[in-house]
Amino acid sequence: MKKTLLFLIAATAMMMAGCSNDDFGGATQGMTLNATVEQPASRATMTGPNDGPYQFSFDNDDKISVGNTTLTSDYYIFTKSGEKFSCATAKPAGTAVDWYAYFPGTTVPLDNQTGDLAGVANYYACAGKTAQATTGANGLAISLTPKVAILRIVKVDNSSTPCDINITTTGGWISGMTAQSSVADFDVETSPSKVTLLSQTAAGVYYIAVPAGKQITIYNGGTKLKATKKGLTAGKYYTVTTGPVKGSATINNTTETVEWVQLWAGGPKFATQNVKDKMTFADATKTGDDYVWGKNWRTPTKEEMTLVNAKLDGHFYSITPLHTTCQIDEESGVVGLRYTGIMPGYTKQSIFLPFDGNKDYLYGNYWTSTSEIATCGTSLDVVGGISDNVDIFPAYYFNPQAYTLETTKYYVRPVLAE
């Protein structure tokens, strides 16, 4: 659904002696234009965890370029202060003409965007015109519509996958947009050489504006990610990941594979199943070819197993999302905890950790590879159950004093060794 940006421009002429005005034959100081934004959205927000409309509203110090079909000088620049835009040097036209408005200006460079959600609003190119010709002496009303879409780039890790976003369209590599003269639209500027729209090294979620309605091909570090035939819809946002968020890897140097999923950008890649048998801490912390599944896998650290926030609140632990949600679930007749990603690009990814017991009373322990106290291991200890359709947890914590005896064996959920 296209988001329309609407603002009203009210024009007033102030009379002062000593300043000539050839259009009106009188002595005036000029014309002041005030603009009021009718869009109630915040500066820049998304309407959901995945693709959907991108909401925008003007902020203080935003500028709009306004001109008409007879204006031979530069565009009038209106600046927002409080609830209104104003331009003290703007003047009404001598005859009824069409007026055009462009945000954030008549030129919008798209290279080297910052990637943050608030900053992408500065590249949110919009254009509009008056519904009918007017001098503007009694006020202007202009409805602006977006001419760009928003790409939400999910960089999946900190090092192995680059984030160097370049986009092509007919004519070359996209570099920016330029307002069309006396048309409520922008032309797409291209370059024969590669142009970087976004470059980031840290895992995370980043946002860039790209021309809407144009066939584009998206590249990351020279690798083709996506291509569109008709172009993206103006005013919407689309999620693109720089690498896979699920896959598979072999175990024990055989052809047998185990699937993995990543639950947040920069997070570990969890196997979708446990090691078959419970393990001692000594075996769980082996690495390389000595590891139970071979060198492609390892036991996660305490930090990597910290998927949610858990805080003791009275007699029970309060569980709130950190990287994932957590809920008691059942899979193939086995009770356990379902962890589902909450970061954009990961909301469809989840892992299921089986526990002993049933939905009314589940319990169990998972090893981490972390040792915080000499001769002890660190385990995730959980006791929980469902009461009156509510998940409750008498225990959900990391135990830094877990025994490392040969008789102490816990579950292990490996992660990919990278």
Task: Indicate where each model-derived feature is located.
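Sec-type signal peptide cleavage vicinity
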Residues: 2-12, 16-257, 270
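Conserved SET/PR-domain catalytic core that frames the SAM/AdoMet-binding pocket
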Residues: 147-160, 264-275, 291-314
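Short consensus segments that form the blades of beta-propeller domains
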Residues: 52-57, 288-291, 402-405
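Short, solvent-exposed loop/edge-beta patches enriched in aromatic
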Residues: 95-97, 293-295, 416-418
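Short glycine-aromatic motifs
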Residues: 78, 124-129, 260, 297, ...
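Short, surface-exposed beta-strand/loop micro-motifs that present aromatic residues
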Residues: 255-266, 365-368
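C-terminal, surface-exposed recognition/capping segments
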Residues: 268, 274-278, 283-286, 302-418
